[in-house]
Amino acid sequence: MRTPLTVAAIAATGVPVFAIKGETLAELEVLVGFDDDLAGEATRISNRIRGLLTSIHPSLERALGPRVTHPAVLEILSRHGGPQGLRKAGRRKLTTIATKHAPRMGARLVDDIFTALDTQTVTVPGTTAADTVLPKLADTLKETLQQRKSIADQIEEMLDAHPLSVVLTSMPGIGVRTAARILLEVGDGSAFATAGHLAAYAGIAPVTHRSGTSIRGEHPPARCPAWCRRRRVAVARRWWPRG
């Protein structure tokens, strides 16, 4: 049975995409799929934490939200919860926790926390309950991220056994997860007649827009496989991080 991905590849290259065979790649596909599920779960929990902080203490969310997946932030939330628990713990205890997990930014993180706490003088309804919920969410997120790390180690071990792994991981911005996904989707590339066919299929070859009266130049193609679009964004963020 042809999947939409297979149909798209045939349309782009004129060559059918053959299924990747082998026990190793079959196991790799299971691990990569599970890692994708864990990534979605981690995003969901992160958004839940940030949403809860926003509802009870917006300033604290601005201080912790962008760094919510950092081990120091998760440990602080896990032990002391929300605004009331953080203030009760005190600066010294939070600094001890933060510097253990983030030696360089620990003190600055605690300063940001207490600066945020001081900007809000009212207690919003639900703050007490948040002190109970936030540690549980932080623990769940820590466990999910740890599972992703463990799965990534297994993926890397399997990927190292493939002859194309060195080529893939040598490309700027491509790590273990992205390399594994590319390998699963395009195989060894033998299904594509030329590199240009593969580039067209992946949506990275420029397309010239022509009409009956003009040529508008070359632009990125509007269509490409969803997996490739997601990976391109991930690579770009890794290679050109936000300043």
Model feature map: region roles:
Residues 1-243:
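A detector of single, family-specific signature residues
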